[in-house]
């Protein structure tokens, strides 16, 4: 695990530690881990803001920070957005994109789920739009989320986003800015 000697898990919350002080402690919160952490914070009468502030106060380094918008009513049509992007129907700072179709080809449910990546996956900022409900159906899981729009930030962009979030306490404004500053589908 990333060169760390010690590994701890609580649900999907992963913590790694090392004798090497320069490596610090590594906290990994993927999808379910973020929700697990939210339950822990609620039990402590804390929120994400206090947690992130505490991490920074203790000298924490933020390598990656993702923000997500859950589309509960199907406003985002990933296939249509992919076509628009491919045909130049979007104004974007980055011309890189990738459209991926995935799913199972056997059984009753042969629906493929679409994923659209906007921007380079190796950059400090890119977007991932995908059909969450179809993705979960291939795992035989149910969700009310039809589509998800993720903003994936790394290194300097991640730190800037966290600092802005802690300064303004306005996640909606931050998400709106990050999207409209990067891409527009007229």
Q: What are these model-derived regions, one by one?
A:
Residues 1-186:
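Structured, helix-rich domain cores that form ligand/interaction pockets
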């Amino acid at each position: 695990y990333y060169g760390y000697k010690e590994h701890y898990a609580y649900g999907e919350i992963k913590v790694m530690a090392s004798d090497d002080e320069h490596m610090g402690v590594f906290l990994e919160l993927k999808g379910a881990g973020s929700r697990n952490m939210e339950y822990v914070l609620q039990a402590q009468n804390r929120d994400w803001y206090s947690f992130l502030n505490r991490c920074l106060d203790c000298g924490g380094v933020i390598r990656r920070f993702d923000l997500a918008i859950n589309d509960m009513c199907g406003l985002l049509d990933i296939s249509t957005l992919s076509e628009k992007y491919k045909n130049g129907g979007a104004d974007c700072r980055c011309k890189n994109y990738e459209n991926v179709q995935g799913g199972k080809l056997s059984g009753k449910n042969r629906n493929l789920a679409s994923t659209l990546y906007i921007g380079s996956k190796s950059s400090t900022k890119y977007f991932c739009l995908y059909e969450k409900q179809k993705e979960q159906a291939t795992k035989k899981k149910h969700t009310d989320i039809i589509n998800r729009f993720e903003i994936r930030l790394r290194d300097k962009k991640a730190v800037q986003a966290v600092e802005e979030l802690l300064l303004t306490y306005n996640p909606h404004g931050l998400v709106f800015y990050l999207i409209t500053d990067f891409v527009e589908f007229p």
